Regions:
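Preference for long, amphipathic alpha-helical scaffolds in soluble/luminal domains
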Residues: 29, 34-56, 85, 151, ...
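Intrinsically disordered, low-complexity regions enriched in Ser/Pro/Gly/Gln/His and often acidic
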Residues: 4, 21, 38-39, 56-57, ...
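Generic secondary-structure transition motif, activating predominantly at the C-termini of alpha-helices
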Residues: 11, 15, 24, 99-103, ...
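Carbohydrate-active enzyme catalytic cores, enriched for enzymes
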Residues: 202-310
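Aromatic-lined, polymer-binding surfaces characteristic
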Residues: 65-244
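Helix N-terminus capping/helix-initiation residues
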Residues: 44-45, 49, 134, 211, ...
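Generic structural signal of hydrophobic/aromatic residues within well-ordered alpha-helices
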Residues: 7, 16, 42, 91, ...
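Extreme N-terminal leader/anchor segments
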Residues: 1-64
Length: 310
């Protein structure tokens, strides 16, 4: 799920600091010497689109979609869905090209929420594209992920939007999990994450924006965090499961019979497949919510007719 291009001042980064970040001194501050491969593989829950993967495969060598979408690396899943060794090679070529072009800090491609999404996607899809790659590619990749994770630790609080902060922290959490961070370190990250979840959601589980697409994106982030935590043996059930279940109930409330969200507050652009696979991964089923008093929605049905009201 790709975040849309956003304009305006979304994070605090002064011009002088932007200049400093283009120096070798800043590059040195991010340097580390990670292992040539990730020490822990975090399984991926999401499917890509084979049709989009086919478009990437048949496009020119320098294929790009819009810059923000490309920088998030959702397209790696699309190539994986297309399948085959050629798609795997194409993914490596595009990843390596991005690393070569963005190895040094850039305000756009290194924006914390964009970077958090990218790091998470690189880690989640790692087991598909990386293990059979040449050793020099694997070493370059892990260095790049480690540098970005260190930068995320610095920059996530600079984002003004708290939902964007959660996406950035998700990338940091997934990245640290993949590098074998100790449980205490991961638990400390969860201590930062969980209060933010409460700050951006209402008592009934709805996102404060009341926008279904943003609500679903946050829910997917939380599922990914829970996935990464459980894969490292950290129990998040008491903290995350209740919130995810609440958010899923709101999602079911918004859906028409065809599976699409009611077109409230900019909704209707989310793929039905993304909605369905997200709800399928919740791991819980429940009755369709009839009213969400804090979020301000109500649903009622009679026979084959359903009315969903804002």
């Amino acid at each position: 799920m790709t975040l849309k291009h956003r304009t305006g001042n979304v994070w605090r980064i002064r011009k002088f600091e932007q200049l400093f970040r283009k120096t070798s001194l800043f590059n040195w501050s991010l340097a580390s010497n990670p292992a040539s491969t990730l020490s822990h593989v975090v399984p991926d829950y999401w499917r890509g689109s084979a049709n989009l993967g086919s478009r990437i495969m048949t496009s020119s060598t320098n294929w790009r979609n819009d810059s923000r979408g490309f920088d998030q690396f959702e397209w790696v899943r699309d190539l994986r869905a297309f399948g085959g060794s050629q798609a795997r090679s194409r993914a490596r070529q595009l990843i390596e090209s991005w690393i070569d072009s963005n190895n040094n800090w850039r305000a756009g491609s290194w924006q914390p929420d964009i970077m958090g999404q990218r790091v998470a996607n690189l880690v989640f899809c790692y087991d598909w594209y990386a293990p059979s790659a040449p050793e020099d590619f694997q070493a370059k990749l892990t260095r790049a992920i480690a540098r970005q994770a260190r930068c995320l630790a610095l920059d996530w609080p600079r984002l003004y939007d708290k939902t964007a902060q959660l996406t950035a922290l998700k990338g940091l959490f997934v990245g640290q999990s993949a590098f074998g961070e100790k449980p205490d370190g991961l638990a400390a990250l969860l201590d930062l994450l969980l209060p933010l979840v409460d700050q951006v959601t209402l008592a009934d589980g709805g996102h404060k924006s009341r926008m279904p697409d943003i609500h679903l994106k946050l829910m997917r982030d939380l599922v990914e965090i829970r996935n990464a935590a459980s894969s490292t043996g950290i129990d998040t059930a008491t903290q995350l499961d209740k919130k995810i279940a609440q958010m899923a109930s709101i999602c079911r409330m918004w859906r028409h019979a065809d599976g699409q969200f009611a077109r409230f507050n900019g909704a209707g652009k989310m793929a039905i497949e993304a909605i369905e696979e997200t709800l399928a991964r919740i791991g819980q089923r429940g009755k369709i919510l009839q009213q969400a008093p804090n979020s301000g929605f109500i649903r009622f049905s009679s026979g084959r007719s359903t009315v969903i009201m804002d």
